[in-house]
């Protein structure tokens, strides 16, 4: 197994054991944020300028989120049932964003990804 595949597999296994189903509090909305398998996989697979550092940050996501700063939200025209909220954090000494997604129909708020730029 290559180093990258091995790193991804280790982070996924760790996240399944330690994050899946766990809840953290989002101060911007006052809602609970759930860690889902979809969000965990999205965070692991999402391209990033500092991909390995992003993978290394996932086990620390709760602390990073707690220290993050709200940076705005957006709607996706192709998915009007979701609003995405962005929280600025630092990975590899550069700004990255923790993405929290809220389903406007079901009310589910989940951790969705970590990105290096906000989608326009």
PLM features per residue range, with description:
Residues 1-120:
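Ribonuclease/tRNase effector modules and their secretory precursors
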């Amino acid at each position: 197994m290559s180093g990258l595949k091995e790193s991804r597999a280790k982070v996924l296994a760790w996240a399944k054991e330690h994050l899946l189903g766990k809840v953290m509090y989002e101060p911007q909305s006052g809602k609970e944020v759930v860690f889902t398998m979809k969000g965990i996989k999205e965070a692991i697979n999402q391209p990033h300028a500092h991909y390995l550092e992003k993978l290394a940050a996932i086990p620390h996501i709760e602390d990073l989120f707690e220290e993050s700063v709200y940076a705005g939200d957006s709607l996706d025209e192709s998915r009007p049932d979701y609003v995405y909220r962005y929280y600025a954090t630092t990975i590899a000494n550069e700004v990255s964003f923790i993405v929290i997604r809220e389903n406007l129909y079901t009310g589910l708020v989940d951790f969705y990804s970590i990105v290096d730029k906000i989608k326009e």
